[in-house]
Each structure stands twice: as C-alpha cells, then as structure tokens.
Amino acid sequence: MNNPKWTPAQQAAIDLKGQLLVAAAAGSGKTAVLVQRLFKQITDVDEQVDVDRFLVVTFTKAAAAEMRERIGKALDEALFGAAEPAQVEHLLQQRALLYRASITTLHSFCMELIRQYFYLIELDPAFRVADEAEADLLRQDTLEDLFEAYYGEETPAFQSLVDAFGTDRDDQPLMASILRLHEFAMSQVHPGEWLEHLPAAYDWHSLDDLMESPWGQVVRQGVRDKVEEGLILLERAYRLAELPGGPVHYLPVLEDDQSRLGFLREMAEKGTWSDIETAFKSAAAFPGLPRGSKKNLPDSLIDEENSKRLREESKKARDEAKKKLEEIKNTVFSVPLTDQLPFLNKMGELVGTLAQVTQHFAREYQKAKRQRNCVDFSDLEHYALQLLAKDKQPTEIALKLQAYYAEVLVDEYQDINPVQERILQLVSRQEEGKANLFMVGDVKQSIYRFRMADPGLFLRKYGEFPHYQEGGGAAPNLVIDLNQNFRSRPEVIQGINYLFYQIMTEGAGEIVYDEQAALRPGAKFVSDGELRTAEGPIEVHLFDPKAIDLSLGQKRGAEDAATEVDSPAKGEGEEFEQNREPESGDDESSLEEAETARIEARLVAARIQKMVLEREFQIHDKELGDYRPVQYADIVILMRSLASVASVYAEEFQKAGIPVYAETNSGYFGTNEVDTVLSLLKIIDNPRLDIPFAAVLRSPLVGMNGTELGKLRSLLPQGDFYETLVLTFWAGDAHRQEEGHEFYSEIREILGKHWESLPQLEVKVRHILETSPEIKEKVDAFFPKLQEWRHRSRRTSLADLLWHLYEDTGYLAYVGTLPAGAQRQANLRVLYDRACRYEATNYRGLFRFLRFLEKFQSQGKDLGNASIVGEKENVVRFITVHSSKGLEFPVVFIAGLGKKFNTRSLSSQLLLHSHLGVGIPLIDIENQVRYPSVIQYAVKERLWQEALAEELRILYVALTRGKERLFLFGHQHKLAEAINKWRSLALSCPDTAFPDGQLRGAKTYLDWLGPALVRHPEDLFKLGSFPTASELPDSSSQWKVILHDQIAGKGPVQEATSSQDEIILPDQETLGEREASEETEIPGETEASGKTEIPGETKNSEETKTSEDKKNLEAQTPETADLDTKNLQEEVFRQLNWQYPYPEGVNQSAKTSVSELKRQSLWYMDNEYSSPSSSSSSSPSALSAPSFLRPQFIVSRKELTPAERGTAVHAAIQHLPLALWRDTWEELAQEVRESMLQEHIDSLIRREILSAEQGGAVSVSQLKNLLDSTSGKRLWEAEEVRREVPFTLSLRLRAQKEPVLVQGIIDAVLLSHQEHEAQVMDFKTDNLAGVPDPELVLTQRYGLQLGLYALAVERLLKVPVRECIIYATSLNREFVMQREAVQAALESVVIV
C-alpha cells in the first residue's frame, strides 16, 4: 500500500491496541485510517491476522463495498511489490479470503448470524426480510384485528384509553400512538422492560422528590433558559436606555427587573419548588415604566427623533423579556404542581394501559410475521441479541465470536442505537488487556436521531476515556482526536471554526467546540501561479422577503415595504410550548413560503450564473491535478428539507437556463402520469369510482374534453360515469343487448336498473351522439378495453397487468414524447417495480395493492421521482443535508437558513424519550379537556434541547461538505430589527461562546449565525468596531455579508450604517447606492456595454417615405382598419411590396466569433484575385445556418472529422496537469512520460470529457512532443499559465458600419508578472506535411486570429503582449509572430 505521510494522531489510530474511540472530524481521512489499520494487521510480519477474522461494521452497503475495494487495492499493491515467496503466498491467501470477510452492515451481520443459528430461536430457515411497505401494512392489519378484539371485550381500561387518545370520529390517533410507541420501544435493548417502567414517571407523592428527579431537573433547566433569554433582553433595554439621548429614567426599573430575574434564575438552579414559585411571582410582576423624560444631554444636543427611537426600542426589548416569563407561566405554571400530583397518578394508570396494549400488539405482530415466515429490520437486531445474550450475559455463540474476531471495527459509531451498541459489546472483548473494539465517528455529525441513533453513547465514552497526547502510549480505553481536515480550503475551515467556537457548546450542542474539536487545514491545493482560484470569503446572502416585490423582481415601494415589513408574518412567533397543532392547510402561509423560496431561488441562480458563465474563479480538479473553470456539476445546493421548495427552485433554475436535478422523497404520487395510471387501476378494480373515472376519461387514454364529459354526465345526473359509459356504448343498439353479445351482462345490468326511464334515456343518448359523434367513437374504443382489462385483472398478476396496460395503451411511450419524458417514463417504471415488490410479499391482488397505496399516502408518506441523472451529468444538484453526509463538493450553497425549525413532532400529545419515557398531558376524560403536565413539559423540553443540538450538528455537516467555496442564503423578516437584535445579543456576551440559554432559544439557523457574524472584526454589517472581536478564535476568517433588496437590475448590495450601539438599515431608496462598487467587472463588459449606435433616419426622401410607410403599416390593425375595397387593394399591394429600410443590417451579425472573422478574411483574400464567376462561395457577411455537432450515435460509428480531431487534441492539452508534473517531468524516463500521458487520456475518457473515439484520435507522441518542445519549455517555465481563456470584445469592422461583439477562447496565455508582459500561444492541428512554406501559410491563415487574441489580452488583463506563438502539432514546431506582425493583420479587418 502507498505510504502517505500520516499525522501523529492518525499513526496512533493505526498502531495502538485496546478499546479505541477515534473522534474523526469532517474530512480527516477516517476511512483511510481504518483501512490502513486493518491492512497493517493483515500484512504485519509479527501479526499476519487473516482478513476474515475481522468484523468491520459500516452503516451502508455502499460504504462496505468501498472499504472492501480499498482493502483489495491495498493488497494488490502489496502483491506487486512483494519479493519473498512466503509473503506473496500470504497476500494471495488474503486476497482470496477478502470475499468472505465480514465487511458488512450491522443488519447484514445479524442476518448471517440468524441464518446460521435459526434453529435456536425456532425460526424457519427460509425466512425473508419483509419490505418496509409490507411491514407497515401488516402492522396496520394486526392492530385493527387487535382493536376489534378489545372492543368485543368492552374492558373499561381500554375504553378509557380510546376516550383519552381517540377523537369523536375514530380511534386512528390511538392506533398511531401505539404504532409509534412500539417502534420506539424496539430501539431499546429490552423493549418489554422499557414499556413496563413507563408508568413510574407519573408515580409521585411529593413535589420535592419530583423536582430532584430527572424530570424535575429538566424543568429547572427550562425555566433557567427562558430566564436567561429574558435577562439578555433586559440587558439590551438597559444599554439602549443609557445611550446619549436615551430614556435614562428607565434605568432604575430595568435594574430592578434584572435583579428579580437573576434571583429567579438562582432559585431555578438550587431552590425548592416553593422557592421557585415565589421567585417567579416576583419576577413576573413587572412594574410600569415611569413617564416623563430625564435628560442626560443638554437640550441643544438632543435629537428628538433619535430619543424617541431609543425609548421605543428599550421598551420593546423589555416587553419581549416579559413574554419570556409569560411562556414559563403558560407551560410550567399553567397548572400548579400541587394540583397536578393526583392527576399524575391517574395518568400513570393510563400510560400503564397504553404500555400493556402495545406489548399485546407486539406479541400479535410477531405471530403474524411468523405465519408469513418473514421478519422486519428491528427483528434482525433483536433476534441477534437473543442469540448473543441470555439473562443479560453472553451466550456460547457470543463467546465463540469474541474468540474468533481479532478485532471489531465500527465506522460511523456516532449513529448507532442502544441495541446495536449491545450487539457490538457482545461480539467484542471488553475485559481489560484484551479489549478489541475500534470505533470511528464524529459526534458533531450525528444527525440521525429520527432513526433512533443515540449520540450519547459516543459522548459518554468521549467524556470518560482519556485522550491521546502526542508521544503517549496505549491505554485500555483511549480517545484519539483526528481534527486535521484534508478536504477543504483554509478559508472554509477557518470560517467553520470561527462560527462553531461561538455556537457549539456542551449545553446547546451536547459537545463543546474546543481545540480538540476544531478543524485544522491539511489539504494541499496545487497552485499554478496567480490563478483566479476559489480562494475567497464565505458569502452570506440575506434578504427580507417582505421588502422585495417578486412580480417586479425588485424592491417594494417605501410605503409597501414599511407596511408589510412591520406586520408579523403568518404563523410567525408560534411557539412549540403553546402545544398548538400545526395548521398544515394554511394556504396563506404556504403561499408566503413559496414566494420566499422563489426569491431565494432567483438570488441563488443569479450567483451561480455569475460564477459559471463569467468563469469567476477556477477550482482544483484532483484527477486532473490542475485548475479548471467551475462547471454546474461542481455545485450542490444543500437544504434541511426539499419537500416544499424543490419544485420552486427547479422552476426558477430552468427559467435561468441552469440545468438542475433535485432528488426528493416526495411528489411522486402527484405526478400526472402516475396519477393517471393509478386512476385507471382504480376503475379496473371498481368502475363505480367517479373521480378516478372522470380522470381517466379526461386523460390521453380516452381523450375527452370538459364539454364531452358534461354531456355524458347529463345522461344520468344522479348516476355514475360508468353507467353513462355503458348507455353510450349501447346507444339503443338492439344487437348489443342480446344474450350472445360479449358485453351482454354488463349492458343488461345497467338497462335493467333504468328500465322505466329507458325510452327517455335512449332519446338523450341518440341526441348526444348525433350532435357529438366523437363521443361515440371514444366510448366504443375505450369500453371494450376496460372490460378486457377487468377480466385480465382477475387471472393475471398485478405486475403483468400493469405492464400490459403500458403496452396496450401505449401510455409509457406517449409520456416519453412529453416534456421531461424520460423522467415520466422512469416514474411509471418505478410504479411497475413497486407492483413487483408488492407481489413478492404475502399480499396479492389489485384491491389490496390500491389499499396499500392509499394507506401509504394517508400517513403522509410519498416517494421521490425516479432518478434519471447520472453522477457525471453536468447539472446543479439539490440534496438534503442528510443525503450529503459523507460526501464532498467543490462549491456548496446552503439555502433556507431563515426557515424556522420544524417543531411539529413536539405538538403531539404523546411524546417519547428513551430516558424520560412517555409524556402525555393531564386528560380529563369526562369533560374532554387537556392540560399541560409537568412530565409532558419535561419530555418536550428535553426533546427540544436534543432537536436543537441536532440542528446545530446538521449545520456543521452542511458547512463541512464544501471543498473550495461556501455560499449561505437565508431570509429574515424585519431584517433591520433582526440585525439590531443580533448586535445586542453579541454585546451582552463577554465570552467566546454564547450562553446556552440564548443558543437554545434559536428558532432558525440565522439565530446562531447572525450574532456570531456581528462580532467579526471585519465589521461585516458596517456597525462600527466591535469590542474584543479580534480575540475570538479564528477571527481572521474571511466572510462577506450581502444584504439584498432586489433580485433584478444591478444585483445584490452590501450596505449598513453605524449609529453608536444600534444599527438602522438604510431605507429602500438608498440601498442601491453602492451597487456599482459591489459588482465584479465582467471581461469584455466595458467594450460591449451600451456603446452601439442606433442608426437614425437620413434626410433622403426615399428613406423618409419608407419610414412613413413603416408608421402607416404599424397603424394597420384589424381593429382600426376601415378601408373601402379600392383602398384595401392598394394597402395590400403596398404591404406586399414593402421593403425593410435598412437592408444592409439584415446580413450583418450583431455578434460573431474569432473563427468566423478569420473565415471572412480568408474569403476576401481568396476572392481578391478571382473573377466573380469563378467563386462559388457566398459573401461571408451573410448569416449562415448554424452547424451542430454530430449526434453520438453517428460519432460512435463514423470516423472523426479533422475539426473533431482538433477539438479532442485541444481538450487533452487543456487538461494537462502542468502544475503537478512541472517539477518531475525532466527527470522521468521517456516510457514513463508516455505512460503518464496515456493515463491522462484514459482519465479524460473515464470522466466523459472525451469520448472513446476522441480519445483514440489523441496521439500520446503529439502530447509528449509538445511538452518536450520549445513551446513546452515555455509552458513549464511561465510564471502563470491560463488555458482556455474566454473573452468578449466590442469592435468596429472595416466591412460593417455597426459595432459587433466578437467572442473567442484563447488556447493559452503565458504571463510574466516580473516583466509585466504576456505571450499568446495557439495550438494548431492542421496537416502541414509537404507544405513548402508552412510559416507563411500559418501567418496568412491565423494572423488575424492571433491579433484578436493579443488585443483581448491587452484590453482585459491590462498586460502588453510581446509575441504570439503557433505550435503546429503535425510538425512538432513552433512559429513565433511578433506583436507588430499580428497587429498589421488585425488592422486590415478591424478599426483599432
């Protein structure tokens, strides 16, 4: 295996023995370390442990496959260098054993264990793992059967449970609660014991005991947090009051407020409940603020407007502090604890019944699974536990595995749950001196609590085990911190450190971000001179959605902005403590969210366009070993959730011309094609369903329009569409109602139902068919098909039926012709796959399949659209932060940072926590009233704290995905007020990290980000210098804050003003003043911006007449023309003979390319000595049809054209890793050079930069000759080489009156910063063999082109061009043209 230079911490993780916890930060090379540790033990001469004696546990099959591949590659490399026969034999043996090695997911390990020892748990060896959808359906069926049995028994306890948790309509909420409780219990090591202990949380006889319990400690913490937030607000009010001109007469009252709240915080920490109640009553009794004014400035210095503002702001801050106390009152003190105690005991009985029913359900569910010979995923772990432990002690199987496995290695240890932890303990040795458990993970990236992951398992070891110190030795239990990041640029790492030093504390994030946790730069980015690399600040883009008019794409008017910004957003301020059910159907809120997402999407799209289209900077390509321009595929947009905004973003990006792909877990069932096919399946199963029937009739399957549907409905206003369809098919045809007709039974059934009104119906049918015969045609075509499909559904499998429908209707092919056809077809294939998977279960039939899908959707579940985008496609990708974990991207946009955290789960009346148990309200069943309970509050508060800690870790994961640049986007209502608040929060914090209470009060990511950025020494918000800013860790990090007030026009602005301790954002009219200075100059913009003259009217009488005719023509419209026949004939004649007054402009391009100009100059050169009759070519100034690249199916079968071969050679030269090879090229043997170049070409083919045919057209010898030539020497020795440099110039051509935009791409620009000059190099693949004077040919053919290149370099880079070089690949020779020579060629065509 290659020997990279390991850091001391990495080397310790590779070498040391014992039970090790490796805390591997993002990008620290944990996988490489794990593989090297394993490889070392396999190949070490002293150890040489067989690879199949290791258990390597990963969390995904992809990760397991990657690890197996890495180990295999390491073994292959070792084999290549092995010399000793014994060593070769050992390595070959390990290579063979690798395929049976236990490198697997934990579920796969459990499965293997169960299949080996199935007989010990009385499981059929042919068992299968149930699909999650099948398991859901089986759980639902089992629970419904169980409820029927309970209802039959009519037990009072169960009836009380239904009354408490059900509704007046049904018992679905109770069913959902039991299913949730069961799922949660199965994540515990002993589910039955955990359920049995739940009622203990409600068994209290004294308040003191309750307050000293875990639940009471959480209540204390909740009170302290709210009081802490109140004190911060009071501190802000106090600071405002003591400012010059402020309301100093408020100060005594504010001091008293702070004193009372400080005492309440002290009592919440250590007082009795009585002490807390007394202190709260005192703290909540806010006296009124004194009236009048006490001046702290002479009258001549007082600004009345500023004084009024300070008074209002101070009062507002104090009012917000009052609200924090009000929140405590509405939760902790809503019902006195003395009154709650008796109710708590009753709730304990209710919880006991709930636990009993859940256990009963668990037993019945197990029976149902055994009957079907299947298990679910939680069974795999619990059956494995049964095999490994008995009476909480290891079994013989466990001891056998402990003896067999030399070491157990666990990846992503921070994401395991207690059951998985117990399994790992049982298969590894735990005793001192023999411990062999190696755990790798990063608790800062633990973001899967919703999958029952418990980061506390990692945290406990991290806190208890000693930490490795460089130079230290092994210990029985040891933590090794890997904090060197080999992924990201230093600018990214420093910014992350600066932020998380301030916001990630043990109280808020469950781990403190300190020197051990902070990232250290470890990646080396190869430099190629002074390139426009991605080195730069982290950009933070903020906007107020109420201040931007989306319809106009710009800022709102001052009145609108003031009115709307000051009004609270819909639903804003709704706290989770209020325990209100979320109003998911709030249309106004949904519309507001969509509008905000649309604004943000446009801002993000504009930033991406600037980056990609203007080639703002280049990124480092690891495979290439060099820099290249940013592509769309390099960019990823991360969001917390895509469910509600992905479609909005995709729409806006498509409008902006940015290719985009969003992989979501929603929206599948809402697509037209899936909805249409499901509607068809529904009417095949039951044709009496009117809504799906109407959907099918309106779909392309039948093709009726609304009018035709209305006519059908008019036949039977009280009937259904199926009956009208049958009557229309019959249409009075006696033959179709005879007994021998194939649809006799269907027709007779409907006719019999309407026998009395049949004559009238027949008249109606005939009338409709006479006036609309197309209805009859459509019905006659569709009805027989429908009957045939219904018969087929009874005798064929569901999957076969579905595929037959696709083929019989042609619908699968049809949707492929629509926009996004490939996506639509993929969605329909997913539906077919789902049907196949459904039939692999114990369930069968169309009806049950449709019922399964209905239940699936009724539970709020959905599927994402089928993926049709490959990894290498050049598109911007939208993914969730969870999906991005473990990945890295060159450019990362993190959007939606202003969206409120989702607290819906905390609104449930049944809250679950692994340590605190079940939290339910106090339920008065008789009066159907619910009150908050102290237990429910404690559970809710702990869940909220843990959820916030996870949100903090999610932010960390998102930020650490970026390799080169980070861009953060978020919205903030009342942005100016928010910035003021952030400043106050920052001023009130003297420490590096913000107080835990403040951090736990966050509602959005910006609540963390804003105060931290306010403290930056660069004064990002233009607030004035901030005290102690430079003392913060990593305060030298680079950030840029951009405040947007519009999304069209000149673009974003960054603007703020300082006013002592407060900030007031400029009004909307002044925000645009600095736009010009914020914009980045676009190459060529100066030359192309608005300088083209518009030809005015001449005084020529004919042109004047033509202009008048044009005006007359524009005036002639169908609405205004009122001419008699003669005048009409004259007008028609005049219009038909009208000629455009500026014919010379028709054949002139407004934009052209360097290649086209070169072609034109060659045409004039060729035709200067030719007679008109001898030239068959047309004038080059005429617009010609564009030429397109040949389709891939032609390219793959035809020989490449010379132009295509030239393009391939240019691409190969463009991507040569010059910087990587510069120092070693001269020392390498010729065969090594050729091998490197061949690998370079193969790499371009693998990365799909070149096709296989193009790669074959590139000669290794040509590339080697270039690098070994004089031109190659120039490339090696240049201070800076820029390749494929695009430009746009505005030029005046001698052959054209109007200016023209000229675009081109320069092959290479060699810059000398020391001499302040440049060379232009162009690579030519022309076949010049046998040409007598190639220099003359090349000079005549390409002189103008090089002249344009030189002009572009001098104008845009502000560097004089000394000379231009043509390198001819066919001759392996360079030709140098001095600047004066190309200037002459340029001036022959261009007016310089």
UniProtKB/Swiss-Prot annotation:
Chain intervals with Basic and acidic residues compositional bias: 305-319, 567-583, 1088-1113
Binding site for ATP: 24-31
Keywords: ATP-binding, DNA damage, DNA repair, DNA-binding, Exonuclease, Helicase, Hydrolase, Isomerase, Nuclease, Nucleotide-binding
Assembly and oligomerization: Heterodimer of AddA and AddB/RexB.
Listed EC numbers: 3.1.-.-, 5.6.2.4
HAMAP family: AddA (MF_01451)
UniProt biased composition (Acidic residues): 584-594
Region (Disordered) residue spans: 291-319, 555-594, 1051-1126
Gene behind this protein: addA
UvrD-like helicase C-terminal domain boundaries: 556-886
Cofactor or coenzyme needed: Mg(2+)
Protein name: ATP-dependent helicase/nuclease subunit A
Biological processes annotated in GO: double-strand break repair via homologous recombination
Record keyword Magnesium present: no
Domain UvrD-like helicase ATP-binding: 3-489
Cellular-component GO terms for this entry: cytosol; DNA helicase complex
GO molecular function, one term: ATP binding
Catalytic reaction equation(s): Couples ATP hydrolysis with the unwinding of duplex DNA by translocating in the 3'-5' direction; ATP + H2O = ADP + phosphate + H(+)
Function of the molecule: The heterodimer acts as both an ATP-dependent DNA helicase and an ATP-dependent, dual-direction single-stranded exonuclease. Recognizes the chi site generating a DNA molecule suitable for the initiation of homologous recombination. The AddA nuclease domain is required for chi fragment generation; this subunit has the helicase and 3' -> 5' nuclease activities.
Matching PROSITE patterns: UVRD_HELICASE_ATP_BIND (PS51198), UVRD_HELICASE_CTER (PS51217)
